[in-house]
């Protein structure tokens, strides 16, 4: 029994030696030749791919879309009969704040449209 084990071991070692010799030589050696496309021109480098930040935000948006789909599906016990919650009404303070901001913005635009031409005209007179 021990002899058969040794014979199998030596056969494996001889096989491994043959394989090592067979894979010792390089199968392919690249030659430095010009690469050309179908028209015979040297191809230009392709433009840069999408930036990492765009890929990150795309992945986040893609995953959040699937999360929303799963939440609205039967998997999260959602039913089609349930209406979405209504948006709470805007409080008076918030509404007045929005109106004040829009009025201030409009006033600044009017001042900008009136003052800049007057200053330019004054420089032309001097």
Swiss-Prot record:
Say what happens when this gene is deleted.
Answer: Negatively affects telomere maintenance producing very short telomeres. Enhances the toxicity of heterologously expressed alpha-synuclein.
**Extra information:** Almost completely overlaps YDL119C. Disruption phenotypes caused by deletion of this gene may also be a result of a defect in its overlapping gene.
Name of the molecule in the record: Putative uncharacterized protein YDL118W
């Amino acid at each position: 029994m021990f002899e058969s084990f040794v014979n199998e071991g030596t056969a494996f070692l001889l096989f491994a030696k043959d394989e090592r010799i067979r894979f010792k030589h390089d199968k392919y050696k690249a030659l430095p030749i010009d690469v050309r496309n179908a028209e015979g021109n040297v191809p230009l480098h392709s433009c840069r791919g999408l930036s990492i930040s765009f890929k990150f935000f795309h992945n986040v948006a893609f995953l959040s879309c699937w999360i929303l789909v799963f939440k609205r599906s039967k998997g999260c016990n959602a039913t089609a009969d349930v209406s979405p919650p209504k948006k709470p009404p805007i409080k008076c303070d918030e509404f007045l704040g929005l109106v004040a901001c829009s009025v201030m913005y409009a006033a600044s635009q009017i001042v900008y449209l009136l003052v800049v031409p007057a200053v330019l005209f004054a420089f032309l007179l001097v």
